Amino acid sequence: MKSSFARKISAGENELVPAVVSVGYLAKKPRRIESFFRSGGGTDRRLPWEQLFFEGRFGASLAEESAGEYAKSLEMVRLAPSASNRQPWRILKEGNRWHFYLQRTPGYRERRLVKLFTVADLQRIDMGIALSHFELMVRDLDLDGYWEVGEPDIEIPNEDTEYTISWVT
């Protein structure tokens, strides 16, 4: 049985809509329901820089000054939205490469509500949003670079940490 949303967008019988993106401008004065969802979803609380960005190895926080011209792009990643506000991305700078890792939340996929409502890997979608925020800001700042897939020889902190892709400058 299709949801009313699926019917509204004319999703086919075998089509799956794992995520929806809203586009537009913020209202000058948010409605009560918007304020409720913003506060309840934790959108105003982001992990601090030192928990997301590393240099050389995991555990060695990247100083904002060491990020150089990429500091603003990393800040856009830090501010990117994510399901349940988990921010499941970690970025490790190694020379001229920025390695992006998915830091899985232990037990996240096993939670009852996530199992009930999830039809896609939301943390992987979150990673895509973070990658987009990074590249859009890099392009806006007119910085050079390209994406490359090739797992680096870096010790990961645990089995919940998965390499995704690298940005090469």
Language-model regions: role of each:
Residues 1-169:
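Acidic, surface-exposed loops and disordered segments
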